[in-house]
Amino acid sequence: MAENSLLRFITKNKVAILATVSAGTAAVGAYVYYQQIKQQQQQQLKGTKDNRRQSEAFAGQNEDEADLKDDGSVVSGSNKRKKKKNKRKRNNKAKSGEGFDYPSLPNGEPDIAQLKGLSPSQRQAYAVQLKNRGNHFFTAKNFNEAIKYYQYAIELDPNEPVFYSNISACYISTGDLEKVIEFTTKALEIKPDHSKALLRRASANESLGNFTDAMFDLSVLSLNGDFDGASIEPMLERNLNKQAMKVLNENLSKDEGRGSQVLPSNTSLASFFGIFDSHLEVSSVNTSSNYDTAYALLSDALQRLYSATDEGYLVANDLLTKSTDMYHSLLSANTVDDPLRENAALALCYTGIFHFLKNNLLDAQVLLQESINLHPTPNSYIFLALTLADKENSQEFFKFFQKAVDLNPEYPPTYYHRGQMYFILQDYKNAKEDFQKAQSLNPENVYPYIQLACLLYKQGKFTESEAFFNETKLKFPTLPEVPTFFAEILTDRGDFDTAIKQYDIAKRLEEVQEKIHVGIGPLIGKATILARQSSQDPTQLDEEKFNAAIKLLTKACELDPRSEQAKIGLAQLKLQMEKIDEAIELFEDSAILARTMDEKLQATTFAEAAKIQKRLRADPIISAKMELTLARYRAKGML
């Protein structure tokens, strides 16, 4: 629960504005923006679609065809109708050459040699004439002729960006997107803030899958203020989402079918295995087995696991894999030895749940089913149920919890984990019954007490929840779990000062434990509050609290380097410090460590948004505009 508080703060507390991607001070930038844009689209679906049509249609128009005024506003409907009424007349003029006056060859083509001999001002004037004829060919959808006349105009005046931009509009119509990019780039080399060229190049890059390039141009457009944000923002959001998914899929394909192969944080492991009786689990190895080497390997693995230390978890992971391989080999030669089957089932069961914790669901289910086939235990059914619950197959996973109950109705972890599932599904009545059952079967385990207290809070009974926490503190005065989870509830209520005191108590209690209990949870929880408090005044950062949050999260990353929440929180603060490279590395690490696809996508989105920010910052002109944008938002109290 403690690690999740930072994520909740990040995703709920920042203003969703375009500057979070392009200017970057607001911590999570793109993901918050992405989530809130989706809500806006649901609320204003028609308006958003209309705006998108306006901006994307504009990308394919030439300089004289765009139904937008010079200030970026849309031309009135009556003016549009006038243009349509005159379209046939203009088409006829384009074919005949009527209305254009420039030196021509006998075949009617412009005499470029003669035109080049004129003065610069005359060349520019004739270049406009040639461009105008190109525009009429464009209107008639004779794009090859339009391109030819725009090229003539360029020969006379190569420093006019409109000519290159109009050629790009022709190539949009013919579908040659590489040429669109080529000619919009030429226009932008002359005039870097040319809005039509920026939009066209962004659209072409999106179609070609160059989403980062598209985001760059769209961010510049937004900073320039050339378009209504409602037109540009959905395009930026769309490209950011596509880029994040592209990168995430590429990363997943490198490790296809094997999950992350990285253990979750020590804090998560301690919480997961905390409900199990360590002495009972270690002693579950059948000592009558004749296979001493395999027995010793399995026994050592479980002892290491329940030592609940950083080294213990890593070694247990390795030993369980080796133990499973050894038992597979032994079973190939002997399938009737009962002690062998029991120990093999135990090794497969724990290796399976480790695969699950590493987000390798398929292998986890195969190993757990194999364990059940050899020798079913409550744990094998519990673990299999959890793998199915992770796939949101609710009906099936409850079936396996029931099998665990049928096998041993007095086993506390079954009720605890099933209660957790009921809790998640907001079935508080059944959750309470299961937590109470787990509590009665093992009154010396703190976790059912904590969940019952949290359950009261979720039901809107804070006073009762607080009283239950206080009673639990009296029973477990030295355990850091109680103040840690109580601090989570206080944080959720906005009682930050009291929450910080509880986190400090939890931190001191954790430091004197031989085993990991709540790990870095108190550090992350306190850092979350301090980070939030440091930015309460939009006009001035509280540097003392901000630096304290940085220090806590840095320490958390050192103590538990596999914690994606510590890294993503530290990355957010590094981004505020303009330490973009460090932020990107931390976001990318978080994406690797994250367990769910949503979490991986979130961290990847952060990283890709930060990369765009870095690219924008590298341009001194754009960087200056970003600072102006930030100053404007700060003045309005939006950051």
From Swiss-Prot:
InterPro entries: TPR-like_helical_dom_sf (IPR011990), TPR_rpt (IPR019734). Residues 1-14 are mitochondrial intermembrane. It is a single-pass membrane protein. Its main location: mitochondrion. SUPFAM superfamilies: TPR-like (SSF48452). Gene3D superfamilies: Tetratricopeptide repeat domain. The keyword Phosphoprotein applies. GO terms for cellular component: mitochondrial outer membrane; mitochondrion. The modification Phosphoserine is found at S55. It comes from the Eukaryota. Residues 45-106 are annotated as: Disordered. Keywords: Membrane, Mitochondrion, Mitochondrion outer membrane, Phosphoprotein, Repeat, TPR repeat, Transmembrane, Transmembrane helix. TPR repeats lie at residues 127-160, 162-194, 345-378, 379-411, 412-445, 447-479, 480-513, 530-563, 565-597. Residues 33-639 are cytoplasmic. It is found in: Mitochondrion outer membrane. GO terms for molecular function: mitochondrion targeting sequence binding; protein transmembrane transporter activity. The chain crosses the membrane at residues 15-32. Residues 79-93 have a biased composition (Basic residues). One of its GO terms (biological process) is protein insertion into mitochondrial inner membrane. Involved in MBF1-mediated mitochondrial morphogenesis. Interacts with TOM40, TOM70 and MBF1. Present with 4110 molecules/cell in log phase SD medium. Belongs to the Tom70 family. This is Protein TOM71. It comes from Saccharomyces cerevisiae (strain ATCC 204508 / S288c) (Baker's yeast). The lineage of its organism: Eukaryota, Fungi, Dikarya, Ascomycota, Saccharomycotina.
